[in-house]
Amino acid sequence: LIMDNPFIGLDAVTRELLYTVLEKLAQLASLQIVLVLSMLDDIPSFITHVVPVDNKTVGEKMPRAAYLQAFREQDALRAEADAASLGELQQRIAGLPYENTNFTSDEVVRLNKVSIRYGDRTILKELDWTVMRGQKWALSGENGAGKSTLLSLVCADNPQSYACDIRLFGRKRGTGESIWEIKKHIGYVSPEMHRAYLKNLPAIEIVASGLHDSIGLYKKPRPDQMSICEWWMDIFGIGHLAQQTFLKLSSGEQRLVLLARAFVKDPELLILDEPLHGLDMT
């Protein structure tokens, strides 16, 4: 049984369920299990051996306990280096290349008694939600709770939004605005976008596509815009991947490219749906 990052995207209850199933299966002498994992905490107790893979190099096989001990010893050394890097990163972020101060409204999002149904299934029922300028929100809930559906209303990706009482950036939906007039204010990344983004362009062009909210790049960026794309790629530690084609990158590298894409236009509203999905501990 081979599973590649099986815990990604699962809520706490489902993770525990999968862990229990794998634990029971591991007791079968006739079954061998190989898990490909990015997070140290995802290594189950029933795993007997760990093979570290770093920078496309396979390390020496180690018993699980020995690997965890060695990792924690190295982690203490990494923490000091990471603290220095974090301080440098914070200084760079403080010097953003530009800052968007052209806010369209103090009321960024307002949903009034919003309900979403698919057939007989109700996803959202009479939801009220207001996001004001300067606020930072976290949506928390189990898989299937309706978080992504809620975000699709804000991102103008749900056709049912036209039948709902929704105001975005001070303007009521369905009063003549286009989807693109809404999207130009929003930076967005999600697992669904990741799966759908199949353009095999250089990574920096994927980042640049965020300037125009397009899947693919159809308008040549100005030199100053390309500089901003490079700046954000450096911030996310992927500057060296700028000319690598997107589909040849690892899933984690692709996610970092799409995160840079979400930030690149200095959006008025930044929506990150499961932003750590598929990223390693670093």
Roles of regions detected by a PLM:
Residues L1, P191-K248:
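ABC-family P-loop ATPase nucleotide-binding domains
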Residues N55-G87:
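Conserved beta-strand-loop-alpha-helix hinge in the C-terminal portion
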Residues I2-N5, L270-E274:
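Catalytic Walker B motif of ABC-type/P-loop ATPase nucleotide-binding domains
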Residues L259:
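Hydrophobic anchor residue at the start of the ABC signature
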Residues D165-E181:
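ABC ATPase NBD Q-loop/coupling interface
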Residues S140-E142:
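The feature captures the beta-strand-to-loop junction immediately N-terminal to the Walker
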Residues V109, I123-E126:
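Conserved structural motif at the start of ABC-family nucleotide-binding domains
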